[in-house]
Amino acid sequence: MTSNALKVFISDLHGELDVFDFLADRQFGILHLLIRQQFSPELNETLCAAIEASAIRLCRAANASQAQLDRTSAVSKEILFTALFLMVVQQKAEDESLTIAIRRWGWLSTVHRALSGDAQLSCTPFSQLVEMLAQNIRTLSAQDFFALVQAFAKALFKKLSPELNIVGDIYDRGQDAFAIMERLRGLPNVAIQWGNHDVVWMGAASGNLACITVAVRICLRYGTLDMLHRDYGINLSRLERFAAKAYGDDDCAQFTPKGDLNAEEKLRIARMHKAISIIQFKLEGKLIARRPEYTMADRLLLDKINIANSTVTVGDAVHPLLDSNFPTLDVEQPYRLSEDERKVAEDLKQQFLASAKLTQHMDILFHRGGMQKKTGDWLLYHACVPVDEQGEFQPFALAPETTRGQSLFNFCELEMRRGYLNRMVINDRNESDIAWFLWCGPHSPLFGKARMTTFERYFVADKQTHKEGKNEYYNLRSNPEFLARVATELKCSSDQVRIVNGHVPVKYQSGERPVQANGKLFSIDGGFSMPYRSATGLAGFVLLEALGQIVLYRVIPNDKRYALEVEYQQILKPKAASVPAA
């Protein structure tokens, strides 16, 4: 990926395609910014919006059509044509077809030369140049007009193609993570900083059984089975047969899936959901046992169940169970899979490893992604750099040597890559376990909490047991001095560095704001995911460094439509040119 003067940052897409497409149509806000920068206050907001809408509708090379153009009013054609041409000239956009067009039509060449500073023409009033464009457009045939608009659009969009940085969590509960990954395949300049939901799928594609069951469980919980079956070719028929057999007399009420389903479908999926959840807890127990360095013994809860009393001990407290039907639980060996459960897990593993489309998408995450990235004066990572209660970088005994800060990021990324590269190799190193640790491990840099309380949320009513406890990083990141220490630890020496995080939704309606520490930190999880919008009041954020500015837009939801509103704007001072040494 090459560095680009136009930089875009978004995060926490969570499989929500509609917001992603809304932003992509607008070059992730750059087109919106450019139009208003170049034509306000000369044109009012209504005309600016009309130009933007016309440009989006007619000028994307893949979508523009002669039929669409023919339905556009003459006035709109003049506005669109003139605005596009002026933007092309002012942005110095170049394209072979545009150059040919300018040579062919002399009046285009005249306006182009005048706007570009030709000494003989530069004194021509701007209004006269605009009128010249408007008059001559009326003489063009529909075919020539269409060809010119496409030439302008291609040149402009090529010029405005940004460096797109996704600060984690393409995957999760939304149904369209597959479609988003397909969109990203076609974009030339994309970087991804892994989120904890992403590494679950990366671990699953590496053959890690715990990650596989987590990925399947989330799809069952949120009703995104089409992505598993239709898109990635993962067949759940063996799981379904097992669930019907083991839980056929169980209403599995605690596992009712989200979404608009009929009663029969809900029950069928609820049984599968419970079946895979129990398999997940057993496999996680095995992983915790072989990885004592993860310090996750508090997540071993199956052995704390008292079936006779229908209770479970969490910490020092005994709680009644919301569901006490465990037909496959062996109280003597609670983490042992039954033979049927083992076959389900192995079947899923073979399918995840064999899915060509999943491998293709995970290749993108590995090849274009990583734990962190520095681009220009920006430092990007999904969640946090873990620190202890004193604000010191938290040590982890994950490797032969204790890791923290930068060495922790380096170790985790290397292990992730090893696990994926060795996914077909049979050995006892279990390198892909790191993906599961990054997903839910205590104070993992992609999770940033003390524990993930999945079991408690299914089986215990007391909400005190559901609390997960954020890392101290989140209490300190509003302090510029702390952020400077973080930047130094992650090898960013510039005093101009700005940090971008996602992961934690900004509760905008409650008064939280995305810009912290005097503009040194941008927290940009704004609610792409529909369930979070009740808390954020938004449909996401998009952060730009473009056209000499830093701009943070709020994405405002309105039924199925969206709008951009400025949250933060800063004009950048031009950097002084470096002087070569004598």
Swiss-Prot record:
Its EC number is 3.1.3.11. It catalyses: beta-D-fructose 1,6-bisphosphate + H2O = beta-D-fructose 6-phosphate + phosphate. Gene3D superfamilies: 3.60.21.10. GO terms for molecular function: fructose 1,6-bisphosphate 1-phosphatase activity. Its cofactor is Mn(2+). Keywords: Carbohydrate metabolism, Hydrolase, Manganese. GO terms for biological process: gluconeogenesis. This is Fructose-1,6-bisphosphatase class 3. The lineage of its organism: Bacteria, Pseudomonadati, Pseudomonadota, Gammaproteobacteria, Cellvibrionales.
